Amino acid sequence: MITWLDPQDPFPPVERALGPASDAPGLLAASRDLSPQRLLLAYRQGIFPWYSEGQPVLWWSTDPRMVLAPHRLKISVSLRKTLRRILRDPDWEIRVDDDFVAVMQACAMTPRDGQLGTWITDDIVAAYGSLHRLGLAHSVETWYRGERVGGLYGVALGRMFYGESMFAHRTDASKIALAALCGFLERHGVTMIDCQQETDHLASLGAEPIPREQFIAHVRQTAAEANISPWRFDKSELTRWTSQASTEL
């Protein structure tokens, strides 16, 4: 049985999350509370929300945990060529926090294999919008000829980035944003991006599962460090993947 959380209640230990033999491995608790304070408490303990419209807020701590080391991002030969072209072409831009809510809404409207509807509900948009206004949630956006064509968003605490979702309206547009983000994070000493759950797509980008215990230990160490400031970069971060040898598919 999972724990029901009232607003003042702490999270239970992550070891109490449902195990792999259950119908919902990793499910830890449920609540109605989705305040910024609750979200920050969750992230600092390796917990994240994921639920559908009409459900209570469901809190998860999966084991293993899917993570991506920024320096191990996999760049295919074709994507490397695209990045080189983008660096030369002024029609392409990387913008940070241009319109955070618009990025969330674009992610919400993107069809996902095996998913009906979206977990990015109005309440989720409002909650993460509050974190964005606090300077703790950010969007990385790929623009082409004045139009947002892809991007991603996530939460940044200390030297830890928690990726939430991405979208692409042009081929590789979300990968372009991720490549820029990884270049920026690597320069600032971030060694792990939380990807939450295992998927083939994340694995193709270089993400790997690690034991939850290892993930939690890393979060406790890095989330307590000073936040990155300023959170600003542009497409020049893409040179990380074009000017020197890096992992290729």
From Swiss-Prot:
Enzyme class, first EC level, given as a word: transferase
Compartment(s): Cytoplasm
Protein purpose: Functions in the N-end rule pathway of protein degradation where it conjugates Leu, Phe and, less efficiently, Met from aminoacyl-tRNAs to the N-termini of proteins containing an N-terminal arginine or lysine.
Record-linked Pfam families: Leu_Phe_trans
Superkingdom assignment: Bacteria
Species for this entry: Cupriavidus metallidurans (strain ATCC 43123 / DSM 2839 / NBRC 102507 / CH34)
CC terms in the record's Gene Ontology section: cytoplasm
Keyword line: Acyltransferase, Cytoplasm, Transferase
Gene: aat
Family matches, as SUPFAM superfamilies: Acyl-CoA N-acyltransferases (Nat)
Known catalytic reactions: N-terminal L-lysyl-[protein] + L-leucyl-tRNA(Leu) = N-terminal L-leucyl-L-lysyl-[protein] + tRNA(Leu) + H(+); N-terminal L-arginyl-[protein] + L-leucyl-tRNA(Leu) = N-terminal L-leucyl-L-arginyl-[protein] + tRNA(Leu) + H(+); L-phenylalanyl-tRNA(Phe) + an N-terminal L-alpha-aminoacyl-[protein] = an N-terminal L-phenylalanyl-L-alpha-aminoacyl-[protein] + tRNA(Phe)
GO MF terms, alphabetically ordered: leucyl-tRNA--protein transferase activity
Enzyme Commission number(s) of this protein: 2.3.2.6
NCBIfam families: aat
Protein name listed in UniProt: Leucyl/phenylalanyl-tRNA--protein transferase
Similarity field: Belongs to the L/F-transferase family.
HAMAP family reported in the protein's UniProt record: Leu_Phe_trans
InterPro entries: Acyl_CoA_acyltransferase, Leu/Phe-tRNA_Trfase, Leu/Phe-tRNA_Trfase_C, Leu/Phe-tRNA_Trfase_N
